Amino acid sequence: MSVEILDLRHFSSSDLRPLLDEEAQLWSKLLAWDYSNSAEMILRYIDARILPGYAALEKGRICGYSFFVYEGSKGVIGDLFVEGDGVRYASPTEHPVETRLLAHVIETLQQSPGIHRIEAQLLVHPTGAVARPFLEDGVHRSPRLFMVLPLASDGKDG
């Protein structure tokens, strides 16, 4: 697969909407999370050309993206998504597009003046699935837990 990585600011919301729609479905399926408001905000920032990040293109079509923001002296990786991320891979080495996108983001943040720390919480990815680019750059990893407590009533009072 020949994938080109380009600056996200070259694209419009209409270019990325199908990908973000797929991502919203994955958030709903995996985390019971309504990602639609976040997706709409991302698309607005893309149209305003103010969201730094990268898009992965295959045969002229966007197949993945990642973005980051600057927050004081740290860079925060806001998201990483590649079409088909709902398909679970057997090993972390089977994520070539994710790996390339993250490598570009990490390198950009490392070269950004005043940035002394990089953070990311990529919740839709299984633990360790996309860790390789971080670990290769000597990043310290802190485990996180995503916990769910069903609050729906079971029909009983009290």
Predicted regions mapped to residue ranges:
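Generic alpha-helical secondary structure signal
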Residues: S14-R17, S36, E40, H95-P96, ...
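Conserved donor-binding loop and adjoining core beta-sheet/short helix segment
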Residues: A39-A103, E107-L109
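Short, surface-exposed acidic/glycine-rich loop or hinge patches that mediate macromolecular interfaces
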Residues: H10-S13, E71, H125
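Short glycine-aromatic motifs
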Residues: V3, L51, E136-H140
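Acyl-donor-binding surface of acyltransferase catalytic domains
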Residues: G86-V87, S91-G158
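Short, charge-rich amphipathic segments
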Residues: D21-E40, G60-Y70, S112-E119, V130-A131
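Short amphipathic alpha-helix that is part of the acyltransferase structural core
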Residues: M1-N37, K156-G158
